[in-house]
Amino acid sequence: MKKNIIMLVTGIVMLSGCDDLFSPAIDNFKDQEQVNSSSEYAQGMLLNCYRIIPGYYSDTDYATDDAVTNQKGNPYLNMATGNWTAADNPVNFWNQGYNTINVLNRFIANIDNVKWADDEEPARLFRMRVTGEAYGLRALFYYYLLRNHAGITDDGQLMGVPLFTTFLSSDANFNMPRATFSECVRQIISDLDSAEAKLPEEYENINSDSDIPAKYLGITKRKEVYNRVMGQYARQLFNGIIAKAIRSRVTLLAASPAFKGDQQAWGTAADAAAAVIDHVGGVDGLAANGVTYYCNTTEIDALKEGVNPKEILWRENIQTADDSQEQNNYPPSWFGKGMMNPTQNLVDAFPMANGYPISNPKSGYNAEDPYSGRDPRLSKYIFYNGSKGTADDGTGTSHDIAILTGSLSGTDDGINVKETSTRTGYYMKKHLRMDVNCNPSSNMKSLITYHV
């Protein structure tokens, strides 16, 4: 998930004499004293760290058994086929991750020196909030580093990544040994504990003084002060429920067989995931159409002010004119490039509607009619031969159009008909809005979208 947090850029021009006109200052670099005197400068450091959070798209599936692509030079395809190198590593996060962690370490060390507000109560609340944000972001960046760069050494040890929690100056020794995988997990969990202790689960305005959460009552008993710092204007910043979600991911990573996970680790991961699900009222608290959050037009069009449907914990800002996903992944007959092609392996993983896997004799699976009676998510997430999609003809009128992917289909949607055709007989449908028209001669405009 890269979040579109607005980058703070502040410029101050001071003309104090003729000499200043001919002696330019260092290009917009602020010294520590200037940062300490302005909460805007200090928050700018933190907001820039949000901007480094990796974007979440589905291209990584090309390196798995779930999808291939018709882009022959795709870096994830190179990973899958063994044609990648250290210099051409699409999952490399080393430099970005450590640069950002070092900024966060400096930010944490300097928090108490910054004037966060003129009045004491909001200043203390701001200090508490940004401290929680910084610890949470550091945990997130260490998670990405661990996920992308941990592994088993030649002598069989499971190693993580180097750990440092203090600011390192440019002349420091950066040649640090790797910590063990378990040490890294403990550090991430510790940072998440710190974040949850300081942050509200969600940033929402409260209606009365009595609604202030207990952990903030030692700072303020006034709702207007609480709302100023912890209210709705802080939506989309790191919060307590995001910390719980990252904890779930970290513990799931630790439970994975790829990292020598054991049965106890699976139990820990399940408990962490349950805490996130319980936050929205359990499985029954989710909307019935939540599986298609990406094309539920009513909900998407209603998004505003950082509000999310229950299926979404964290997302980018909405994009009001973006059809890049549709252009890249629609079938050729819909003027798309058909880039992501689900594999038969993924299609076979969808069970029958009765819950049985298709390999089970009780499933009722019919190889002569392979898509009938399947889990309804199959038709929502994947275009298969004969499946229908609701396409717009460019005038605002929608039609159900069958996608024919067989090699003898007689359309450009068939297997390997052209460069933009599927390689597997399937096209990705998940993440795509069905009311976008990619016909270059169409007058239909791109529509609202967002990434989670």
Describe each model-derived feature in a short phrase:
Residues 1-28:
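Bacterial Sec-dependent N-terminal signal peptides
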Residues 18-64, 98, 114, 297, ...:
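Membrane-proximal, proline-rich intrinsically disordered regions
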Residues 40, 44, 74-151, 169-204, ...:
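Conserved, well-structured interaction surfaces
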Residues 146-148, 153, 203, 253-262:
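Short coil/turn linking the two alpha-helices of tandem helical-hairpin repeats
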Residues 204-232, 285-302, 397, 404-417:
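Surface-exposed intrinsically disordered loops and tails
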Residues 249, 255, 277-370, 376:
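Polar, glycine-rich mid-to-C-terminal structural blocks
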